[in-house]
Amino acid sequence: MKKFDEYPILAVTSDDESYPFGMRKMSNNSVIYYKGDISLINATKNIAVIGTRKISDRGRKLAYETGCILAKRKITLVNGLALGCDAEAIKGALSEGGKCIAVMPCGLEQVQPRLNYRLAEQILEKGGCMISEYPVGSSIQKYRYVERDKVQSEISQGIMIIEADENSGTMHTAEFAMRQHKRLACYYHKMIELSNGNLLLENSGKAKVIKTQSDLEEFIDIVGEEKEFQQLTLL
């Protein structure tokens, strides 16, 4: 079993065919660093599954089950490997043999958060990928989390929000998704303490509200049918 440190850190430039299509179109960064199979980004449909670190019991269940469903549908899961919703979604996807892409806000010689070190190894073991805009030695800075949130949207065709506070990093990704004309969805929650961001999106009419598994399946179908880089009309 390979350890995280045994996977080489490689780089790809914007003139290489394996450079993420979405970032070529929307990002000013000409170099991306990665571990694992970067071709995965362009080869599959990707949905970012994101949410709060302070996850509720219901949010934990929804994140895990969403990851499972995406894996069964052969959709690659994208997020920032954060504690809470991100990690649970990854665990669900990996449990069904799915592929995951984790976007780091730092150099790839480290895993952020450190608590998800083993989960990062599992992503790579299962044929997934970890990417970063930052070279080895780049420290963790607050603004880099916001830039990471932008990348999550750039490399995804759809964004699914499990539960989020309205002032969270998750909502940064939602805002980027709207600017980039990406498909956006969020789960409906009766209890809004940890999900007032979901309520904000629901009331805005700019996200598909997921109340049932059939709603989720419909969202996946819509994302799966989209042509690459088509300018999308928000749901």
Where do the PLM segments sit?
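Glycine-biased, small-residue-rich flexible motifs in mid-sequence functional cores and linkers
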Residues: 2-235
